[in-house]
Amino acid sequence: MYYALVGYGVSNKALCEKLISMGHKIFVSELRKFTDEEKEWFSKKGIDFEEGKNSDRICEADRIVVSPSVRFDHPALAKCRGKTFSDIEVVLDMNKPNFVIAVTGSNGKTTSCKLLSFVFQKLGLDSYACGNIGTPAADVLGFKTKYLVLEISSFQLFWSKMLHIDIGVVLNIQPNHLDWHPSLEHYAKSKLKLLEFSKTGIYNCSDQNIMKFISEKSNLCAFDPLKIRKVDDGIVYEGKYYTFKNDFLKTHQNLQNLSAILKIFSVMNFDLKQVLEILEDFKPLKHRMEFVDEINGVVFLNDSKATSSAATISALENFNSRNVILLLAGRGKNEDYADLIAQIKRKAKHVIVFGEMVELLRDELKLSDIPYTISENMQNAVLKAFEISEKGDVVLLSPAGASFDMYRNYQERGEHFINMVKLLRGKLLE
């Protein structure tokens, strides 16, 4: 079969390597310039390519696999929309596992997929997690697994026509990626396609945006984050008490994730008590409400993964008193920040802003009378936060914006924050 790959990012690069090894004809179309190493590899493998443009030549292929980053209204693709596919769609069509669980949502996707995989592994069940989680879906090609856990983005769902999913889960829908999607409705309907693709669709019935745009189907099953709450040594889920001592999973966002996970395992007829016993050993993920250090009674938390206002709102929900010094930064996604400003007024004592976020929030912060400081960079922000802090305060990096204004990704941003906190501790010891 003849494949055109539009965009040569992580997912399509992995797919290209698999497809060429299977004997398929490949044409790669990419707006950026290829490196000499990439061109050499293309030549060695007999792969035709174009760079600096996406021409009509892509329409000559039998299948056009669109990278998640390629815009939905790309003019070259409008002429051959009937041939467009996502990488996940191609992978599932070629490699049919026994059972596929797919997860999407504005927040909590990666953690939820990690929780599912963790339980399967601890039970000795053959499983594999891939997709938007960091491991390309194409990596699963060539071997069978009993349980395939997929993290799927709104972009991948938009480009997908049909996915064969056993259980599909929509965790939540909050305004996000509105620099790509033209409206919240467009974004929400892309997410909700997952329920249409699934034998059993699980959705958050407490999420207003899901309930606004969802279509009633007989295959749907609801989970309700309002029916789970933490108690001192456990949780109460759907009216039943369970011993559970993992404090990381008892934070605001993770209780929502846990509610979805328990609904999945309930649908699969797993013993929920056993599932929770396993999850007590689950360790926190990097850059998600990650404890960094405590210096002179001031706690530093790294939540660099919070790349939208909804994620930062959720992070702030973990604090009951206004003892948070919040670091905001990054590139906006065409969001309305009114809800974020309201949450900051309730939860934070001071805001420090740097990067492109300064121009987005300066006027709103000024009008809201929230104490704020504009900083040049991460190092100055950390130093200023500690300077104005008091014992018992929390310095929280939860940026509410994408990292690409100053960093390659949210991981690099989070590591920079960690290093600046280490530098601060070192200076205090001098």
UniProtKB/Swiss-Prot annotation:
Binding annotation for ATP: G105, S106, N107, G108, K109, T110, T111
Gene Ontology BP annotations: cell division; cell wall organization; peptidoglycan biosynthetic process; regulation of cell shape
A single cellular component GO annotation: cytoplasm
Compartments, as annotated in UniProt: Cytoplasm
Tagged with keyword Ligase: yes
Highest taxon above the source species: Bacteria
Organism: Pseudothermotoga lettingae (strain ATCC BAA-301 / DSM 14385 / NBRC 107922 / TMO) (Thermotoga lettingae)
Keyword Cytoplasm: yes
UniProt-listed NCBIfam families: murD (TIGR01087)
Substrates-to-products reaction catalysed: UDP-N-acetyl-alpha-D-muramoyl-L-alanine + D-glutamate + ATP = UDP-N-acetyl-alpha-D-muramoyl-L-alanyl-D-glutamate + ADP + phosphate + H(+)
Gene: murD
GO MF annotations in UniProt: ATP binding; UDP-N-acetylmuramoylalanine-D-glutamate ligase activity
Family statement drawn from the similarity comment of this UniProt entry: Belongs to the MurCDEF family.
Residue ranges crossing the lipid bilayer per the database entry: none
Name recorded for this polypeptide: UDP-N-acetylmuramoylalanine--D-glutamate ligase
